[in-house]
Amino acid sequence: MSEQQKYKVIKKFADFEIRDYEPCLIAEVSVDGSMNQAGSYGFRPLFNYISQNNISMTAPVIQIPVKNDQWKISFVMPSGSDISNLPISKNSDVEIKQIPQGFYACLKFSGNYSEAKLEKNLNLLRSALVRESIKEIGNENNWRSARFDPPFKPSFLKRNEIQIPVNWNN
């Protein structure tokens, strides 16, 4: 199993949980296209970067909406990575970025990754946040999707998530 981005579960609700994610480094590309196209187009240069530099694959693969048909796709770098010792990519589209600590509301769902399934679960999570009086941080494109499994894994075993940054003071 791949190393996963480090977090602590702060609170569990019936249908989602609040997590405190540790700071991390990511390799990221910006991609134009539909949600599904962006996931495919963005994966290749990131996979080439880690493969060419002998960097372990981690989970999840993160996809963030920028605006209509524009996305950021990222791989989390292994724990212990330091921006000063990660190689510079030969592909100028791949950027290494530091992501700060943050609280996220996370909703898990299984199956194949599709726009309809993503939209449904995003709406479920947003409704749950309203129900629990938890405030989102950012605008309507503040969410990110997280895919944890390789494409060849049977769909009923695949783990996906919607993650929304939240204010958490409890």
In which residue ranges do the predicted regions lie?
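A solvent-exposed interaction/effector surface
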Residues: 1-170
